[in-house]
């Protein structure tokens, strides 16, 4: 996600200045703008399902990076990266939100829902 790595997300950190101001590098929060810099402060993170696609030029690499950080810290996480070949098109950033009734959007929502239902069922069984 572009918001998960705002300090060093490169050209795709387009949310940094609007959210933190043009002087974001001078703020006390600057060292804590990337998810991998703050994850150690969390006591526990919930199961996390990440969705991206080959056409997600805004956040594909950062979503994979976030997945790697979550995995390295023992967080139950799953990622689904929709390839162009799956639906014969490059799906855009947040396609499941923009196109929830298209086949790819419906599939993404259904898979995320199944992931969270399984995680909640497992938690309830403990």
Positions of PLM-derived features:
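Alpha/beta-hydrolase superfamily serine-hydrolase fold, recognizing
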Residues: 1-126
């Amino acid at each position: 996600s572009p918001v998960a790595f705002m300090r060093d997300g490169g050209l795709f950190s387009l949310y940094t200045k609007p959210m933190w101001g043009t002087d974001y590098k001078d703020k006390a929060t600057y060292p804590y703008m990337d998810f991998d810099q703050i994850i150690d402060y969390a006591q526990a993170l919930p199961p996390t399902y990440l969705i991206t696609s080959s056409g997600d030029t805004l956040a594909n690499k950062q979503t994979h990076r976030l997945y790697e950080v979550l995995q390295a810290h023992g967080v139950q996480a799953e990622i689904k990266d929709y390839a162009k070949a799956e639906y014969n098109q490059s799906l855009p950033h947040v396609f499941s939100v923009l196109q929830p009734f298209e086949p790819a959007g419906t599939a993404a929502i259904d898979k995320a829902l199944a992931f969270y239902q399984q995680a909640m069922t497992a938690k309830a069984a403990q």
